[in-house]
Structures are given as structure tokens and as C-alpha cells.
Curated annotation (Swiss-Prot):
Protein name per UniProt: UPF0329 protein ECU10_1810
Species: Encephalitozoon cuniculi (strain GB-M1)
Region Disordered: start-end pairs: 319-422
Compositional bias segments (type: Basic and acidic residues): 319-340, 347-356, 374-383
Superkingdom, taxonomy of origin: Eukaryota
Length: 616
């Protein structure tokens, strides 16, 4: 399913309506806000065609993670007794909503032009169904021996319980779609009648399929695979970190653009995955390594499940398994060599002790001299440890700006706790200049996508690229609390990777949730160089116009060697005279406030980098 289609389906839940003109207007508004330019007539026509053609069926799955503020309170493997006491009441409210959330996941259907009737039908079936005897909260709290249900177990029990309603829903859906085919207005043109009938026929057939055991089992199996995939991801720390950054940014985005239907309760996230493709991939490979990695890619990179994404995943997993096998063999070899070295060293020490014993018999030493020497050595060692401890107390502020050490500290040794070191590429520093100078450099540069941009476009791009103050955070000891590193890849003979954090960009009273992207590569001197730095709004990623996922491998930046001779370590960096920005550091946020240079009391915009979600 295309990224446009996913966005349209997302909007159905937000708008609580399905009039096509209203959806187009909402898409237009969000697209223009995200990309900071007006859509052309051709672009609007593409949107219209996409919305008119798409019919959203059997694509939704529930992601078994629950956030409360900046805390992750439920993971796939969380049991009720594992939940922090202060969060249990909130968690139980979320779990109580599972029946309606699961029902929405199973039956959410987007009908181009008018979905009101399907939404009304969905609500009617749910409200007239008795849930007597099924209480997900009681189920979750129940323990058998010392072990209770995991959150994914409760989710799946709820799915299986709700599947019983699908027969009634499917029958009514097919009946009403059939009736609407007979009622198609004669005032429509032949082409419009054809489109309307085709769409309703698809829905009628889908309703009939929902009554079949095969379709019901497919829905259950798809959600079960997602739950298992999320558990697989959760148990791999390197994957968990990236997954949580993406999930947390989606959670924050949903809070800024949607009004909660359940008051102060934040429901679990949903994603759009083709059920049939997911199930068939699992049936083909029977490997959670492959399916778990595939779902991770789909979730992080916004990809569809198709032959290309499946093949890429299979190759990636096999390469990783081979690398892990080679690494394991190398570690075993090193352990064997180390054991042999230790054995030889022990043998040499024993022989040395024997030779010392023989020497003492021939020549006696001065009484107590050995004890004095040992004491002196111990005092010297303690003195060195105190000196090293003092060295480690270099302040974060000094390290962030590359400042000199305090005079009281030794200048002969380097602090072990010094922050991260990064050089900054010319293409990043370019954005600190005026829009006119940036345009001149881009027009003469080798990057085709940046040529011939208007001054207005450059000024808008400058807002999200001129965030060089983020380097202060990147170089600090706190960087790992805000950013995760992605997998590394090779391009043009250089090793590249990204660091990604969650950010909120504010301007003119509007907030945009997104990610702070940092692109890095390893230079010939084995140093880390920042060649890409920007804030990317979630709406920009959803719009998909030339936008790449923050977690996707690869990029379109070439010719890094062009600016390699003009790298900077950003020590003591200052903006040109007259430009003002202020850094505000808090416990869980790093905020950059940009002010009007002519009137510093006026805030133009701000960027807040948020600490990673806390896992309870």
C-alpha cells in the first residue's frame, strides 16, 4: 500500500467523516505545512486520484506497546505484576478499552466518497454484542502460580473473542453494499457509475469474505505474527532502541494532531500491514528472525511488504547470521588463545617463584624492606587513582564547546569521561549562512536536488537544517540518552550511519513532531564526520515526496570528499554577529530557542530534542 494511501486511512480516524472533498482539503493542508510550499494543480490531482481509487481493507494491526507521557508502561512481554504500582490504574484503563480498539482494528474500512455507513455499521454491531463473561482487565490480572499473562496474550485473547462478531458484520456489510449498488444515482456519468459500482462490489465481496473461516484465521494470524515480531524486536536491544524511537515519535505525533476519543487515555499504536502478504511470508520461511526483521523494516522505513522488501530482509538476515557465526568462531579462537597464554603465564610465574625461593636461601634481605617497598608502591597507586578521578570531573560545558581544562587539573592527561568527538562537514556548515549565500553555493554545487531553489524555499529549508547547536548535545556525555545509532552501511567506499532522536519544532504557535537526523561517515583518519543534520517532521515522511525514512539504509548524498578539506570540530562555534540562539537544558529535554536578532525578546522558532522514552 502506498504511503499516500496509509495517510488517507489515517485521516479517516482523525476526521470521523469520509466526505472526499474534506479529506482532500485536510491532506492538502498537512502536506503544505509539512513541506512549506503550496501544492500545484497537478499535485492536487494526484492526491484526488489516489483517494478516489484506494479502498482500505484488512490492513490494520495493533502494536502491543503503550506509552504514558514519556514512559513506556507496557511492552509486549509485560505482565500485570511487572507494572509499576503508580502506573497500574492507568494501564488497567487502557486494557479495559481493548475490545473496542481491537474491533476498530479488525473492521476499519475506508470507502472513497462516503464511509459514514460503514462506521455506523461497525459501531452498531459492537454496541449490540454482549461481552458478559469477558473482562480483559481480570484476565490480565489473573496469575497461575507465579506467572501471569503477557500483554500480547491478552491482546490475542481479545482478538479471538471479537472475531465472533465478524459473521454478523460481514453479512450486513455485504447486504448494504449490494443495496447501494442498486441505488447508484442515474445522474452520474457512465465512468462515475463504473467507479462507484466497482468500489461497492469490492466491499460486498470483502464483507462476504469476512464470514469465511479462512479470512477470520488470516486476521488472527496476522495479529499473532505482529505480536511475536514485536516480542522478537523487544528481546534484541539493538533493534528495540530504534523501534522505540519510531514508536515514541508516532505516539507524540498522534497526540498533536488527534483528539483522543478516550479522554486522558492514550490508546496503543496501530500500523497498516497487508495481512495476506505478512501471513504468506511467514508460511514460506517459518522463521521469526526473517519475519521479525521484515516487520521492523516495514515499521521503521514505511515500506510495503513485497518481493523486494522480503528478499532484502532474507539476504540481510542471512548475512547477519553468517557474520554472527564468524564472530562466534573468532571469539572461541580468542578464548582458546587467551587460555593458553594464561596457562603459560601461570607456568612462568611458578618457575619464577621457585627461582626466588632458591635465591633467598643463598642471600637474606634486610628485615622489613619488602614491606616498606610494597607500602610505597601502594601509596603511589592510590595517588595516581586520585589524580585520574580529578581528571574525570571536567565539566560538560567545557567539553561541549571544546574549552580548556581548569588550572587545578593536570594538563598531561586526557579525561576519560570526555564527550564524543565529531567533525562537521562543509555541507552542514553551509546552512549557518544567509539564504542568498546558501542559494549561490547550492546552485554551483554538485547536488542536483538543491539547484535552482527559490530564496523562499531556501529560507524554509534553513529553518530545519540550521540546527548546528545540536552538536553541543551530540558531543556531550548525555548524547546516548537522546539518540540511537542505526545500522552501518557502505557507500562510495565510506562507512556511513545515522543517529536519530525525537524532536518537536515550534513556530508561530504550531508544533511539529518529528526526528532529528544526524548523518555520519568515517573519514580516512578514522574520525566521525557529520555530513547531514536536520529536523524532519513526521508529516514530511508521511507525505513521501522525496522523503526518506530516518532509519532507512542508504542516502542520496554523494561527493563527500568535496568538503572533506574544510571540516570543523565546532570548537567555540558562534553564529555571525547579530544572530541569537539560546540553549536551554532540562532533565529530559535539550531546547534551542531562536530569537529575532533585531529584537531578542521575540522568539522566532524553537527545536526541542527529547530524551528517549523511559522504559519501566
Amino acid at each position: 500500500m502506498s504511503i499516500w494511501s496509509l495517510w488517507v486511512l489515517d485521516l479517516v480516524g482523525i476526521l470521523c467523516t469520509s466526505r472526499i472533498e474534506k479529506i482532500i482539503e485536510e491532506v492538502k493542508k498537512r502536506y503544505e505545512k509539512a513541506l512549506s510550499h503550496e501544492l500545484s494543480g497537478a499535485e492536487l490531482e494526484i492526491i484526488r486520484e489516489t483517494i478516489e481509487e484506494v479502498v482500505g481493507l484488512d490492513t490494520k494491526v495493533l502494536i502491543p506497546f503503550v506509552f504514558h507521557g514519556r514512559r513506556l508502561v507496557i511492552s509486549p512481554v509485560t505482565r500485570h505484576q511487572d507494572i509499576e504500582q503508580g502506573e497500574r490504574e492507568y494501564v488497567e484503563k487502557v486494557v479495559k478499552m481493548l475490545p473496542i480498539l481491537v474491533w476498530n482494528s479488525i473492521t476499519c474500512i475506508y470507502v472513497p466518497g462516503d464511509s459514514d455507513w460503514t462506521i455506523d455499521l461497525m459501531n452498531e454491531i459492537f454496541k449490540t454484542t454482549s461481552f458478559e463473561g469477558f473482562d480483559p482487565v481480570t484476565l490480565y490480572k489473573r496469575t497461575r502460580g507465579k506467572c501471569g499473562m503477557r500483554f500480547t496474550d491478552v491482546v490475542m485473547r481479545t482478538f479471538r473473542h471479537n472475531i465472533g462478531m465478524l459473521n454478523r458484520f460481514g453479512q450486513r456489510l455485504a447486504q448494504e453494499a449490494g443495496a447501494k449498488i442498486q441505488e447508484i444515482s442515474s445522474s452520474l456519468s457512465d465512468e462515475e457509475k463504473r467507479k462507484e459500482e466497482k468500489m461497492l462490489q469490492i466491499i460486498k465481496e470483502y464483507g462476504e469474505s469476512l464470514c469465511t473461516k479462512e479470512k477470520q484465521e488470516e486476521i488472527i494470524k496476522a495479529q499473532e505474527i505482529v505480536c511475536d515480531a514485536c516480542t522478537y524486536i523487544w528481546r534484541r536491544p539493538e533493534d528495540r532502541a530504534s523501534f522505540l524511537i519510531e514508536a515514541y515519535s508516532r505516539y507524540l505525533h498522534s497526540k498533536t494532531v488527534e483528539v483522543s476519543k478516550h479522554g486522558d487515555i492514550d490508546e496503543p499504536l496501530f500500523d497498516y500491514v497487508d495481512h495476506c502478504s505478512l501471513v504468506s511470508t511467514y508460511e514460506k520461511y517459518k522463521s521469526m528472525d526473517i519475519v521479525g526483521e521484515l516487520f521492523l523494516r516495514v515499521f521503521l522505513e514505511g515500506k510495503d511488504i513485497n518481493d523486494e522488501s522480503v528478499n532484502d530482509t532474507v539476504c540481510g538476515v542471512r548475512e547477519r547470521e553468517e557474520a554472527e557465526k564468524m564472530r562466534g568462531e573468532e571469539e572461541r579462537r580468542k578464548k582458546e588463545e587467551e587460555s593458553l597464554r594464561n596457562a603459560l603465564e601461570l607456568l612462568r610465574m611458578e618457575e619464577k617463584e621457585k627461582s626466588k625461593g632458591k635465591g633467598k636461601k643463598k642471600k637474606g634481605g634486610k628485615k622489613g624492606s619488602g614491606e616498606v617497598t610494597a607500602k610505597m608502591e601502594e601509596e603511589k597507586k592510590d595517588s595516581e587513582e586520585v589524580e585520574e578521578s580529578a581528571e574525570a570531573e571536567v565539566s560538560l560545558e567545557e567539553m561541549a564547546v571544546g574549552g580548556a581544562r581548569s588550572k587545578e587539573r593536570s594538563s598531561k592527561k586526557k579525561s576519560r569521561s570526555k564527550g564524543h568527538r565529531y567533525k562537521v562537514h562543509k555541507r552542514v556548515l553551509r546552512w549557518t549562512k544567509s539564504a542568498e549565500r546558501i542559494k549561490a553555493e547550492l546552485d554551483e554545487g554538485s547536488e542536483e536536488k538543491w539547484r535552482n531553489k527559490s530564496i523562499e524555499e531556501i529560507e524554509e529549508q534553513k529553518k530545519v537544517h540550521d540546527i548546528i547547536e545540536v552538536c553541543v548535545l551530540l558531543r556531550s556525555l548525555d548524547a546516548n540518552r537522546f539518540f540511537v545509532s542505526t545500522n552501518r552501511y557502505m557507500k562510495d567506499g565510506t562507512e556511513r550511519w545515522k543517529m536519530v532522536g525525537v524532536g518537536i519544532f515550534e513556530e508561530g504557535g504550531e508544533k511539529k513532531v518529528g526526528k532529528v537526523e544526524v548523518g555520519l561517515y568515517r573519514d580516512k583518519g578514522e574520525g566521525s564526520v557529520i555530513y547531514h543534520l536536520m529536523f524532519k517532521a513526521m508529516d514530511t515522511e508521511k507525505a513521501g515526496k522525496g522523503a526518506r525514512s530516518s532509519f532507512g539504509k542508504g542516502d542520496d548524498v554523494e561527493g563527500l570528499e568535496e568538503g572533506a578539506g574544510e571540516l570543523s570540530d565546532m570548537s567555540g562555534f558562534e553564529y555571525p554577529k547579530g544572530v541569537r540562539s539560546e540553549i536551554v537544558k532540562g532533565g529530559d529535554a535539550f531546547k534551542i530557542v531562536y530569537r529575532n536578532p533585531k529584537d531578542t525578546s521575540e522568539v522566532l522558532r524553537s527545536l526541542t530534542v527529547l530524551q528517549k522514552a523511559e522504559v519501566l
